[in-house]
Amino acid sequence: MFGKLNHLAITSDHYTLLGMFYRAMFGLKASGDTAREIGAISVGDGYVGMTLIPRRGGRKAGLDHFGIEVEDLDKVRSKLAKKYPDIEIVKRPGNRPFASYSAHDPAGNYFDLSQPGHENRAEVYAKGEWKQETTFSHFAIRAREAERLADFYTDLFELEARNLPSEEGGYHLTDGRMTMAIVPWKISSFNGAGIEQPGMDHIGFRVPDIKAFEANRDRIAKTNIQLAPKPIPFDAEGAARLALLQKCPHGTVQLADPDGTLIDVAQDHS
């Protein structure tokens, strides 16, 4: 596969808390580089890295963007210039542990681009791959023109489309290990709940034993209330939002991190 879906990013006022949450809840590993973690913390599963970014003034909190590692960045630049001339690709500051460049899709969702061997790569992105039982499974984007975005990502990064039951008009693209779900954004989807802008929707994990995961989740919440998942269905609006999340075919248990980022979890049956 030409493109690897192996980077996620969350912006937060509590990035150090989230670092502990994802390590405790899902067994993700951090680099342990304190000098770099003053600026941001990256955690990973041996394939996907997720950078937790301190929120600056004017920047929104929450699930922020994703990234794609490519074999040949020049090939991507050439294809963008030829087929999508209105889409920009820009060089990023050298202190990013993953991103060498960033671009955007036709809907304006921005994503980072990286290539093995680039000098800026650091932390979990420079450690090489390792194996662990709990891993990322997918992330989801809500978009007005889901089909157009699916065509864009399959064309540019040679991702494989999967035929899965989903929300009507949804698409699921995979690099063989991680899946990008592109689901339609409709204002009516949020009936009974707070309306959210199009953009990134949630992240997902696969675990070896869903019952053991739930027991560990409850143990963590009792041990340290600050690491407890934020409740989703605490009222009628929350229940409506949970019902929307549950339409995703990749998960069976849903929760939110302490900041409210939605998470979908399923047992690995491979």
Q: Where are the regions a protein language model picked out?
A:
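Structured core of small recognition/catalytic domains
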Residues: 147-233, 238-251, 258
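Core segments of cupin and vicinal oxygen chelate
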Residues: 1-49, 95, 99, 140-187, ...
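A short, sequence-level motif marking secondary-structure junctions
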Residues: 54-59, 117-119, 184-189, 269-270
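Vicinal oxygen chelate
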Residues: 4-13, 41-44, 55-132, 164, 172, 218-270, ...
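Short beta-strand/turn micro-motifs at beta-sheet edges
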Residues: 53-55, 124-128, 188-193
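Short, charged/polar, Gly/Pro-enriched secondary-structure boundary elements
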Residues: 47-51, 60, 108-111, 177-181, ...
